[in-house]
């Protein structure tokens, strides 16, 4: 029977040691809560950090970019600009389309933003053109966010117009109703319509004009209320044949009489079933298709949204004819799941490595089981808190748990090692557990709260970067806190029941060999430490050198923002000469598609040509290249992009810009390259002067590649210069001229055909097959005030000019975006600095302002990094100062930090990695890790001075030897916890590797140096404290 120690021993652990059943059940409750939480947690690529974003699209077929800007975009922008919480407003006005993107503050709920947008649209309605075919339509989506899923719909037996009609009605609408879906777009533009192609010569010969035809069609096809009859006994609803449904009915429409004979529409026009917009087209691989892109709402969970679509697809495709084939070409969640699976595997690997290192040091199965239980218990228990905080299982939270593997075992190791030491001295397990746990309790609290203090500044980071790492910091802090609780409750209780002198003394051949090895290492360390203490100034110079070296490395290391991920999808923009037509662009696109599909890494390709709100001009095309899974291709995405661009360079007359899709999207515009830089002015003239000059300079910079601009001001324009005096004499107004031109060349939507399921348009235009180009303008006829027909050429001259193909605004002012990539041998920091230097040399006028796009977040993150690290150090100093009731000891502990910085930065440079936000988080974590060596040394040195009356030198020397094994064990555990991240090669490895590299490098260097520098600095500050006390005492005596 064991004699129980006094109730004063054991500290907070005593209750749990003495009540094993209650302690066990408490831990089981934590375990069950964590398991339930894990099953309830959603899965995503990254924490949800999207800005609330809404896109407003207005289509006005036939309108020029200038008309779209002044008549549609500007009135809407004025209303939107008055909304509270608006962070940024950008717009793009192109031929027939206006797209306004509204990005709100992170704190504004999306539903509130939606209400404000709807109110603003309502307020602007009276200012918009009266003949606008449809009112502005808004969607809760970020247009720069790549689709979560892309589907291609093809058919070998049906025309594309019928295919799109069925897909829009039976598939797209249903998918739009799924929770989390923000927008479903159908690219390909094959919406059914009745197209009326007027024969200009025929109507001119009959003395008619296109306006006569338009008036006749709109008057003949109506769908309005007619009333009802209510008699004494019966009620009758009135109806009529006021609707025409088919092209054949329109052919028979009488548009005028001449000499008593009817003139039917079919006599002067070709009337056929066709597409609403003939200048739109989409292809899947080499086959014409309807391409369906599904985008999520900002903040929606991508995995659950995609799962819902997958579940609904079989049911939707069953409603389509068998000749219609629906193919899922890309699904971003495939790579997200693979990335999360790889991270989970690395987490399990980290746990296995940590348990292995524990056994290597403790050489005892019962002693290994105890921390082996503490690690998974701490990690699994964290899931319960994550559910409560609405977190998700994503790459960052799993990275936090992987790193936590090395952290959470530290507490258990320190407790076990201390209790084992007393058992080996002959004390009973229960007494040793009470004594050891009570003695080490303060150290555990110091380790825990000082490490959590390092994470506090991460919670106060602003904007999107702060939101991004909040889940990481809190997840890690919760795991560390649960670990501390487990180490002060379950660990000493298990030590009291599972450890004994016999089990600790029982050794096999491996145990004896490893014991001798550790004894030799400790002896060698003791000899080295004695020499270092005899030459303190040399050691201090090494410590100062690491501080200076860390500053130099910080200055010179390449800096980036966020690792470029390989998600298996490449977005592309194909650019042709600005005067390119739709037919010309479609042909070039097919040539490029043939080249791309020959690459062995490419699985499928979708492409789109035309202007419909997603593409700005006819001379550009959008491409989405879907790569094979990572394990089925030899190269990562950057090498594939380089290879594709080299191959496409052989296609004449086109430029191809490619960039890999990323899980983190900050910009609101689809860009040609990875990074953007904007020039904003008060007028388009200022941009036309300075953009070419800046582009010329930037294209010469070696720090940039793929430099391009969306400034296109060489679009061909046929300017109709009307002689107003001549027109007025003939009774012809400018409205008559505009109407005649719009009727002929605007694919004008003049009437609507209503059916039970959908609505279709009647499109009016001139048949220009026999009069191509500017010659078609000679066929335009106008009606004078006396009823005569007047050629347009008699009152107007046609001038060929140049004008912008699209007009972009940022916060209501003209803007152009310069896109660029960064070559492999340079960093984003180099590129940003080179752009800023170039900007200074040009001496831009004051009315031109510049701003970075996604790189603005990089500048903001980089600017706050130093303060973030300073805040972490200050937070730790405050916590340690409170815990030790000392101003000096925290400085001794913090003196270990420069060594970690040197190791991390050197490792990143050797590995060729940039110092990005992921690596910076690793350095901040190192601040919390490496100080534990000093804490364990100083705690025992102070206890030896206080309880055994040792001198500071003897106390710190003994503390270093006594704590060498747990220090080495905990450092190796943390290192092995980060090792799987450093060696990661699977999907999403680009995101995880910088964290692992920085931590492994920092831990190795700090472990080697702090074992020697910390004792010397401890003695230095001890002498400084004695000298300060003596000075104060002398002053008091003199006083």
UniProtKB/Swiss-Prot annotation:
Membrane topology, as annotated: Multi-pass membrane protein
Transit peptide is among the record's keywords: no
Main localization category: membrane
Pfam family, one: ACR_tran
Domain of life: Bacteria
Assembly and binders: Part of a tripartite efflux system composed of MdtA, MdtB and MdtC. MdtB forms a heteromultimer with MdtC.
Protein name: Multidrug resistance protein MdtB
Species name: Shigella flexneri
Gene: mdtB
